[in-house]
Regions:
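Condensing-enzyme catalytic core mediating Claisen C-C bond formation in acyl metabolism
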Residues: 1-50, 149-205, 209, 316-389
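Conserved beta-ketoacyl condensing-enzyme motif
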Residues: 7, 53-113, 223-249
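Acidic, glycine-rich active-site loops and adjacent beta-strand->loop/helix elements
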Residues: 11-13, 79-84, 111-116, 139-144, ...
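Short, well-ordered amphipathic alpha-helical segments that serve as non-catalytic structural scaffolds
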Residues: 31, 53-68, 90, 206-222, ...
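Conserved catalytic cysteine-centered active-site region
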Residues: 34-38, 42-54, 82-134, 251-282
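Flexible, glycine-rich active-site loops centered on histidine and acidic residues
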Residues: 128-161
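A conserved active-site cap/scaffold subdomain adjacent to cofactor or substrate pockets
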Residues: 201-222, 227-246, 250, 271-276
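Catalytic phosphate/nucleotide-handling subdomain of diverse soluble enzymes
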Residues: 288-337
Length: 389
């Protein structure tokens, strides 16, 4: 008998600062509605130098790992575009910070915004073969395009942590999925750069084309059609992108279903609208947002479109489980988002420039205002100094 495998728990972390998108629009000489409606973003996470992908991942993972679970994690698969080292995996730093058992396998997975999906599917296959195993999958990034660039409004950052197990509480993954790879230069980041290079309009077109391709292939493989779905969850670099994706397939549904799919989309974009782009974590923040704000019942089939520039697309699906509400702490997430401090555009620009420099100097970061459990205190002897409070 095949074991049912999928997402048992989800944790999420984003730093304690945000920038208001209407304020940014005004500062950049744009109509605020371009950002609020045209792009579909209201707030953007601002990442202080004291947070990086490792600390954000630790802050997300610590929400879902009890001491007993920490001892049981067989593997850590860390999806990220914002790696902090060209050799050593962020998963190794993370495993140490969290106090995981040394009997764990810890690696980093890279393919732009697709890394966490690769991690999730590899984890699911591993658990199908080893049903007792628990795998920690991370999607953590700092989405960084540059001050006064077209991509600036689509920045953000944070981490999603998922525990993949047999008989999961939140979602069982269907075994079938459809994926597609093409060598496309829509978004990339050479190792000498801290900001992505992007052909913005082209990237949005490739996203939509890839969605069309994998959705058609998935339907062919499964004989399922849109009527078999209760909601679609999209990679959301900005919320308008997923809205365009959904619009592409809505005509395949009857009017009643169109209404419910649109309502589910509104729920799925709510939290992303207030955090911004997490690159590889965005799809899974959108899932969390749907679970928090949507009206789904157990047994619902959800469709997922994952996209990572460069480019890789995947469509996969899963079934919502009866106790899905127990798999995440919705109240903690509401508090995390509500307690963030708004920074002005000038403060955001200062913080943007204050990131840990790309050189070998020793640095002590201003950690006095840091409220997160895990943070970065600086760099000594070319080693990042991670701390827990
Ligand atoms: N009121 C309402 N809407 C307005 C408006 C106003 N006053 N002014 C403009 N708009 C609308 C425009 O009509 C447009 O809507 P449509 O796309 O529906 O036509 C929207 O606002 C955006 O306007 P522009 O196209 O003029 O915006 P832009 O040229 O400044 O750039 C962008 C938009 C290309 C997305 C840019 O922000 C960018 O390059 N972002 C980074 C790349 C990106 O996120 N790509 C997504 C796919 S790649 C991916 O998914 C991987 C990843 O995470 C990086």
């Amino acid at each position: 008998m095949t074991v049912s495998v999928g997402i048992d728990k989800i944790g999420f972390y984003t730093p304690s600062l945000y920038l208001d998108m209407a304020e940014l629009a005004t500062a950049r000489g744009e109509d605020p509605n371009k950002y609020l409606i045209g792009i579909g973003q209201s707030k953007q996470a601002v990442i202080p130098p004291t947070q990086d992908i490792v600390t954000m991942a630790a802050n997300a993972a610590s929400q879902i790992l009890t001491p007993a679970l920490k001892a049981e994690v067989a593997m850590v698969l860390f999806g990220t575009e914002s790696g902090i080292d060209n050799s050593k995996a962020s998963a190794v730093y993370l495993a140490h910070l969290l106090g995981l058992s040394p009997k764990t396998r810890a690696i980093e997975v890279k393919q732009a915004c697709y890394g966490a999906t690769a991690g999730l599917q590899l984890a699911a296959d591993y658990v199908r073969v080893h049903p007792q195993a628990k795998v920690l999958v991370i999607g953590a990034d700092v989405a960084r395009y540059g001050l006064r660039t077209a991509g600036e409004v689509t920045q953000g950052g944070g981490a999603v942590a998922m525990l993949v197990t047999a008989d999961p509480q939140i979602l069982t993954l269907d075994m079938v999925s459809s994926y597609h790879t093409e060598d496309v230069m829509d978004f990339w980041r050479p190792t000498y750069r801290t900001e992505a290079l992007v052909d913005g309009k082209y990237s949005t077109n490739v996203y939509l084309d890839f969605f069309k391709t994998v959705w058609a292939d998935y339907q062919q493989q499964t004989n399922r059609t849109i009527v078999d779905f209760d909601a679609f969850v999209f990679h959301l670099p900005f919320t308008k992108m997923g809205r365009k994706g959904l619009r592409q397939i809505l005509p395949e549904a009857q009017p009643d279903q169109q209404k419910s799919l649109k309502a589910a989309f509104e729920a799925s974009q709510e939290d992303n609208r207030n955090v911004g782009n997490l690159y590889t974590g965005s799809l899974y923040l959108s899932l969390l947002s749907l679970l928090r704000h949507g009206q789904l019942t157990a047994g619902a089939r959800l469709g997922f479109f994952s996209y990572g520039s460069g480019a890789e697309g995947e469509f996969f699906s899963g079934i919502l489980q009866p106790n899905y509400q127990r798999g995440f702490d919705g109240a903690a997430l509401t508090t995390l988002l509500a307690q963030r401090k708004r920074v002005s555009v000038a403060e955001y620009e200062d913080i943007y420039r204050a990131q840990l420099s790309n050189d070998s100097r020793d640095v002590q970061l201003p950690v006095g205002e840091e409220v997160a459990q895990y943070y970065l205190a600086g760099r000594q002897n070319q080693q990042r100094q991670y701390r827990e409070q």
